[in-house]
Curated annotation (Swiss-Prot):
Substrate binds at residues 163, 192, 249. This is Homoserine O-acetyltransferase. One of its GO terms (biological process) is L-methionine biosynthetic process from homoserine via O-succinyl-L-homoserine and cystathionine. It is an enzyme of class 2 (transferase). It catalyses: L-homoserine + acetyl-CoA = O-acetyl-L-homoserine + CoA.
Length: 305
C-alpha cells in the first residue's frame, strides 16, 4: 500500500521518481480501508528535506499511511516559505483533539540550549504529555528523542568536546526486539550532534532498554515501554549527501569542523560518499509501523482509553 500525501506536496514527486507508491486523498478514499495515521512534528529548519526523508521511510511498507505534517503553534520558521507552511502544516493547537497511530518528533539544531531555554519548550512539553492520551506510539529522533527522554525520565543531555560527526558502527543489543527484526549484528548509522546521552543515566532510569549502541558514540536507540515510545539519537533518515551538505556548509562558513568519519571513501571529501545505512533505516521504520499496525485499535478514537 502507498503513503497518502497531497499531490502538490514536494515529497509526492520525489517519492514517485524513486518508485515509492504514493496516492492523493481522493485515491486513498476509494480503497475503503483505515490507513495508519502518522504525524510528523517537524522541528527542523529545512522542512521539505525532512518531509522527504521521513516520507520515504514510512511510505515503503505494505501498509497504507496517512501522513500529517504538524508544527509548533507559536514558533515561526525562517527557512521554509510561508506558503508551504500554510498549505501543508497544521499547528499543534489545531490537532490536539485528534488521535494518531504514530507520531515522529524530529530533531532540531538547538543542542547548545538548555531544554527550558528553547522558545517552544512549554508547548513541546504539552505535546509530549498529549502523546500519552492521543498517540499509540511515538518516535523521538535526535534532539526530539533527547527531549522526550529528559521530559519523561529526567535523563540529561551532555555537551561533547568535539562534534560526533560521521558514520559509526552500532551493535545490535536486543536481537529479539521486534523493532530490530531482520537487523544484522552490527549496522552503520549517520551521527551529527554536539551532545550525548549517557548509558549509565539511561540504565539508572526505570523502564528503559537500549536496543542499539556504539562504543564510539554511545547509546543510539532506546525503548520506553511505559510511554509507548522509541528514542533514537542518530540519523537513519539522512539522505546519502546530508552529512556532506552539513560539512560543506560549515567549511564555507569558516567554522572549525572535522571531516565526517567513515563517510567518504578513505575519509576523502573529494570523493562521493557511500550510503551504508539505507537498508537498516527501512527495516527500523518498517518494523515500527508493523508494531503499530498489530497493536493499535481499529477504532482510532479508542487510542488512549
Amino acid at each position: 500500500m502507498p503513503i497518502k500525501i497531497p499531490a502538490d506536496l514536494p515529497a509526492y514527486d520525489v517519492l514517485t521518481r524513486e518508485g515509492v507508491m504514493v496516492m492523493d486523498p481522493d485515491q486513498a478514499a476509494r480503497q475503503d480501508i483505515r490507513p495508519l495515521r502518522i504525524g510528523l512534528l517537524n522541528l527542523m529548519p529545512k522542512k521539505i528535506q525532512t518531509e522527504n526523508q521521513f516520507a520515504r521511510l514510512i511510505g515503503a511498507t505494505p501498509l497504507q499511511i496517512e501522513l500529517s505534517l504538524i508544527r509548533m503553534s507559536e514558533h515561526q520558521t525562517k527557512n521554509t516559505a510561508a506558503e508551504h507552511m500554510e498549505s501543508f502544516y497544521r499547528p499543534f493547537q489545531d490537532i490536539k483533539s485528534e488521535k494518531f497511530d504514530g507520531l515522529i518528533i524530529t530533531g532540531a539544531p538547538i543542542e547548545h540550549l538548555d531544554f527550558q531555554d528553547v522558545t517552544y519548550w512549554d508547548e513541546l512539553r504539552e505535546v509530549m504529555d498529549w502523546t500519552q492520551t492521543n498517540v499509540h506510539s511515538t518516535f523521538g529522533v535526535c534532539w526530539g528523542g533527547m527531549a522526550m527522554i529528559n521530559h519523561f525520565h529526567g535523563v540529561r543531555k551532555h555537551m561533547l568536546e568535539a562534534k560526533a560527526f560521521g558514520c559509526f558502527r552500532h551493535r545490535n543489543l536486543a536481537p529479539a526486539s521486534p523493532y530490530l527484526r531482520g537487523f544484522s549484528d552490527e549496522c552503520v548509522i549517520p551521527v551529527s550532534r554536539w551532545t550525548e546521552m549517557r548509558q549509565s543515566e539511561i540504565d539508572a532510569a526505570e523502564g528503559l532498554k537500549t536496543l542499539l549502541g556504539s562504543d564510539q558514540v554511545g547509546p543510539c536507540l532506546v525503548q520506553d515501554k511505559a510511554h509507548r515510545a522509541l528514542y533514537i539519537f542518530n540519523h537513519f533518515e539522512y539522505d546519502s549527501e546530508t552529512l556532506k551538505q552539513e560539512y560543506d556548509r560549515d567549511v564555507a562558513a569558516g567554522n572549525q569542523i572535522n571531516v565526517p568519519l567513515n563517510y567518504y571513501p578513505d575519509d576523502d571529501p573529494s570523493r562521493a560518499p557511500l550510503n551504508r545505512w539505507r537498508s537498516h533505516a527501512h527495516l527500523l521504520y518498517g518494523n515500527w509501523l508493523t508494531e503499530i499496525y498489530q497493536d493499535t485499535p481499529y477504532d482510532i478514537d479508542a487510542i488512549g482509553r
